Regions:
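N-terminal Sec-pathway targeting helices
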Residues: 2-20
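Serine-esterase "nucleophile elbow" of acetyl-processing enzymes
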Residues: 28-113
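Alpha-helical scaffolding segments of alpha/beta enzyme cores, especially the outer helices
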Residues: 135, 139-143, 182-189
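A short helix->loop->beta-strand "cap" motif at the edges of active sites that frequently abuts
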Residues: 148-152
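Catalytic His-Asp segment of secreted/periplasmic serine-dependent ester chemistry enzymes
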Residues: 161-241
Length: 241
C-alpha cells in the first residue's frame, strides 16, 4: 500500500512539474512575441510612418527614395526652392530588396510626377551578388513603369566610398568599389531600358582614386553638408523641368 501511495505522489509531482514547465514555456513565448512586436525594426517603423503620411501628402510631387543617404538628407535645405514639394522616403540600411518590398506604400501611393532613386550600396557592402542587385533594380523600375507610367524617374548611380568606412566596419572599400564600378553601368542600362534618366553621381563625387573625398563625408559612406550640396547642384536642375 505504501508503495502505491509513494508512486501516486511521485506521479502527481511529475505532473505538476510538467504543467509548470509548459506554463513557463507558453509565458516565455508570449513575452517574446510581445517584446518582438514592441521592438520593431527601423525599417518597419519607417514604413508605418510613410503609410500614415500618405493620406496627408499631395499627389504629383517629387519623391526621393532609397537608403540612409536619402534618409539623412534634409530635402527642404537642398531642394526647398523647387516648385513642387519633396517627400523623403529613404530608410537607413535599406537595400534593393527592401525598396522593392515597400514600393506600393512608399512610392506608388503618392503618385509622384518625379522620382529620384538611389539604392544599392548596402547590398554591395552586405555581400549581395551583382546579379541579384541588378535583378532587384530591374524589378523596381518595372514596377514603377507599370504603376506610374507618367512619372519621370531619375536613377542615381551608387556613390563612392572612402577608407574611413573600412576603419570602423572592416568592410573592404577596395572590393566594394570594384563592385560599384561594375554595377553602375548596369543601372544606366536599366534606366535606358525603361526610358528613365541616369546620373553618374559616382564620377561627380569621386576623386582621382575613385574614393569619396573626406570633406564630402563624415564617415566614408554618408554625405556631409558639403557632400549634399555638391550632390544637389547636379540633381536639382533636373527636377526643375
Amino acid at each position: 500500500m505504501n508503495f502505491i501511495k509513494t508512486h501516486k505522489k511521485d506521479f502527481i509531482y511529475c505532473c505538476v512539474i510538467v504543467l509548470l514547465a509548459v506554463a513557463a514555456l507558453v509565458l516565455g513565448v508570449a513575452l517574446a512575441s510581445k517584446k518582438s512586436a514592441e521592438e520593431k525594426s527601423y525599417y518597419d517603423k519607417k514604413c508605418e510612418v510613410f503609410a500614415a503620411e500618405n493620406a496627408n501628402f499631395s499627389r504629383g510631387q517629387i519623391v526621393f527614395i532609397g537608403d540612409s543617404i536619402t534618409d539623412g538628407c534634409a530635402l527642404d535645405t537642398y531642394y526647398g526652392a523647387l516648385d513642387l514639394a519633396t517627400y523623403n522616403r529613404g530608410i537607413g540600411g535599406d537595400t534593393t530588396a527592401g525598396v522593392l518590398k515597400r514600393l506600393d506604400s512608399s512610392l506608388v501611393a503618392l503618385e509622384p510626377s518625379k522620382v529620384v532613386l538611389l539604392i544599392g550600396i548596402n547590398d554591395i557592402n552586405g555581400g549581395v551578388k551583382k546579379g541579384e542587385i541588378i535583378d532587384n533594380y530591374d524589378k523596381i523600375l518595372k514596377k514603377i513603369s507599370e504603376s506610374l507610367p507618367n512619372s519621370e524617374v531619375l536613377c542615381v548611380s551608387i556613390l563612392p566610398l572612402n577608407d574611413d568606412l573600412e576603419s570602423y566596419t572592416g568592410i573592404s572599400v577596395a572590393k566594394s568599389t570594384e563592385t560599384i564600378l561594375a554595377v553602375n553601368p548596369e543601372i544606366e542600362k536599366l534606366a535606358e531600358k525603361y526610358g528613365y534618366g541616369f546620373v553618374d553621381m559616382f564620377s561627380v563625387l569621386a576623386d582621382d582614386e575613385n574614393r569619396l573625398p573626406k570633406n564630402l563625408s563624415p564617415d566614408g559612406i554618408h554625405l556631409s553638408d558639403a557632400g549634399y550640396r555638391k550632390y544637389s547642384t547636379v540633381i536639382k536642375p533636373m527636377l526643375c523641368d
